[in-house]
Regions:
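Bacterial N-terminal signal peptides
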Residues: 6-17
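Flexible, solvent-exposed loop/hinge segments and secondary-structure transition points
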Residues: 22-161
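Positively charged n-region of N-terminal signal peptides that target proteins for export
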Residues: 1-5
Length: 161
């Protein structure tokens, strides 16, 4: 009888935990289309008409893509992948490229859609990446692309709380 009572008690406790876990609703911050557009326009204006700018939301979906008048066609994919790399690793794509240049973490470079090139910057609220921006095609190279991406984020910094 005591074994049966213990079994019933354990099942009741497990049932209480599982039903309360299902009842929780996640609340996540994400980048709005207006914020994404402001970041992209600012980054494009800071750089040159030759760049492409991609802004992704927290799930890696493209929110905004701007291609400058003189941008090369391949810059769309490069900008998106730089932004994706920054988003998924929550650091600039240049920092990630340095970190994965050799050693045990070098294998991360073979993951789909990541790219070891600078020009991608995460959009952070505390420790959470709510989006990212990536640029490609700046005549000053990856350092200029990163600076332009950061200028775009700086434009909305007061809203990132």
């Amino acid at each position: 009888m005591s074994v049966r009572l213990s079994l019933v008690a354990v099942l009741a406790v497990l049932g209480a935990f599982s039903s309360s876990a299902r009842a929780q609703v996640l609340s996540e911050k994400n980048i709005s289309i207006k914020m994404a557009l402001t970041i992209a326009e600012t980054a494009l204006n800071e750089c040159t008409p030759r760049v492409s700018v991609a802004v992704l939301d927290r799930a890696g979906r493209m929110r905004v893509f701007l291609q400058g008048d003189n941008a090369s066609p391949h810059n769309l994919e490069l900008a998106r992948r730089k932004a994706y790399t920054a988003l998924t690793f929550r650091r600039t794509s240049a920092e990630w490229a340095k970190r994965t240049a050799e050693g045990d973490v070098a294998g991360q470079r073979s993951l789909t859609d990541v790219i070891p090139l600078g020009g991608g910057v995460p959009i952070m609220i505390g420790e959470d990446a709510i989006g990212s921006v990536g640029l490609s095609g700046a005549p000053g190279g990856q350092a200029q692309e990163e600076a332009c991406a950061k200028a775009g984020i700086a434009k909305v910094q007061d809203q990132l709380k």
